């Protein structure tokens, strides 16, 4: 069988039925409904838009196909979410410095290809495929080769795979050694014609995640803390309850269109306070409520009675999560008014409670935020893989990444030393930060 990679500029050119047949994960961000909502909700560009959005995110899905000599029909083996990018917003693996270096040397860094889920800094699979594990390694590598050839042909600066899970990351790590390729890995080229004239490069970053150690309730979780840290969290939570706050958790069809409108108002207002605008539209959120409510969790904070106004709607803050069987993903937050510790309650403590109540093993609350450490979120190494077309820049970036990786690992170890846990709750290797690809 000869394999080839082709590209399409909309997920609708693939279709929901084909996507579902290949989907081998319950990750919410890989669902057809989520990715289609980004296009249809005008968060990213789409060929179906009457007026070009010019979002800087242009769908370029990579489709790996197998061709049998005795058949004219191609078999779709794997699909990867790939996008042309005209900037670096909404990626959360920061390469602005690389772009500036290109510009200083009179070179164009954009467009580039990003192999990722838009606006979603969350580790997950980076292909959909029904192939067995060994096949999936080859499929990742053949798609990577297709991206490399596509970048060279279209004069893109390179491609970047962001937040791959263990399977995706380990398959791409092997491309750091171009001699790894053999005839089984190649598309149409022989090994001596490989487009990987220089290697892919690994990058790491650090997030803070929560892990469920069979806790029975939130109090049981806090037993893991030192006395002082436990008192601090109890004080934060008690202060809100004593003020009269009420917190509601809604899932699936319990979430109404009115709830989403209220959430969206809070979401955009929170961005507006920083003179920014959220990447996602109301239409996007309405569509995912219609098409994938089973993977949504909405936390609402109601006004204390003493603060209620003539407005009958007493919801002051919202946090919207996604979920699957083993993971909770904290993604979007907004509030009408600022209250002390309200963000921590809606975005962290309510999420932890939900995980404990539903036996969910892992909680990814979103990128950045050292304030998560004192609340028991552990430093967690995330990964990305990069291929840069320009040989000299590729070497310079590779040198930079090797130094950066040492700094990131040292930072994660140092952050772990500030976790609020008592000695009996510490891991036998307390200085080793968790690696997200192993979760």
Language-model-detected regions and their locations in the chain:
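N-acyltransferase acceptor-side catalytic subdomain
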Residues: 1-439
């Amino acid at each position: 069988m000869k394999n080839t990679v082709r590209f399409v500029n909309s997920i609708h050119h693939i279709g929901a039925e084909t996507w579902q047949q290949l989907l081998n994960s319950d990750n919410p961000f890989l669902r057809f409904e989520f990715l289609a909502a980004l296009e249809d909700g005008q968060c990213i560009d789409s060929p179906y838009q009457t007026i070009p959005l010019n979002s800087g995110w242009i769908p370029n899905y990579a489709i790996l196909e197998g061709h049998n000599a005795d058949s004219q029909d191609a078999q779709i083996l794997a699909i990867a979410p790939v996008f042309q990018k005209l900037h670096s917003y909404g990626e959360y693996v920061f390469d602005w410095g690389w772009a500036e270096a290109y510009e200083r040397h009179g070179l164009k860094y954009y467009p580039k290809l990003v192999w990722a889920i838009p606006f979603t800094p969350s580790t997950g699979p980076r292909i959909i495929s029904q192939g067995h594990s060994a096949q999936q390694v080859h499929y990742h590598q053949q798609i990577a080769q297709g991206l490399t050839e596509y970048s060279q042909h279209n004069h893109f600066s390179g491609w970047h795979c962001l937040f791959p899970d263990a399977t995706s990351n380990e398959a791409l790590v092997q491309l750091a050694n171009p001699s790894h390729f053999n005839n089984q890995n190649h598309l149409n080229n022989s090994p001596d014609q490989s487009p990987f004239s220089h290697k892919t490069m690994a990058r790491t970053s650090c997030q803070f995640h929560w892990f469920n150690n069979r806790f029975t309730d939130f109090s049981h979780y806090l037993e893991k803390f030192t006395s002082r840290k436990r008192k601090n969290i109890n004080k934060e939570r008690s202060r809100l309850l004593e003020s009269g706050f009420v917190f509601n958790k809604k899932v699936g069809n319990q979430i109404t269109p009115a709830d989403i409108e209220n959430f969206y108002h809070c979401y955009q207002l929170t961005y507006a306070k920083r003179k920014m605008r959220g990447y996602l539209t109301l239409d996007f959120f309405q569509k995912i409520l219609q098409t994938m409510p089973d993977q949504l969790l909405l936390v609402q904070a109601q006004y204390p009675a003493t603060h209620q106004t003539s407005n009958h709607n007493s919801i002051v803050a919202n946090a919207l999560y996604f979920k699957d069987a083993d993971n909770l993903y904290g993604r979007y937050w907004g509030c009408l008014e600022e209250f002390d510790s309200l963000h921590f309650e809606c975005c962290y403590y309510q999420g932890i409670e939900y995980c404990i109540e539903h036996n969910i093993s892992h909680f990814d609350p979103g990128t950045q935020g050292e304030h998560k450490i004192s609340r028991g979120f552990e430093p967690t190494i995330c990964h990305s893989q990069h291929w840069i077309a320009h040989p000299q820049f590729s070497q310079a970036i590779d040198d930079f990444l090797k130094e950066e990786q040492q700094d990131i690992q040292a930072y994660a170890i140092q952050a772990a030393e500030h976790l609020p846990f008592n000695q009996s709750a510490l891991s036998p290797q307390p200085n080793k930060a968790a690696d997200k690809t192993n979760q």
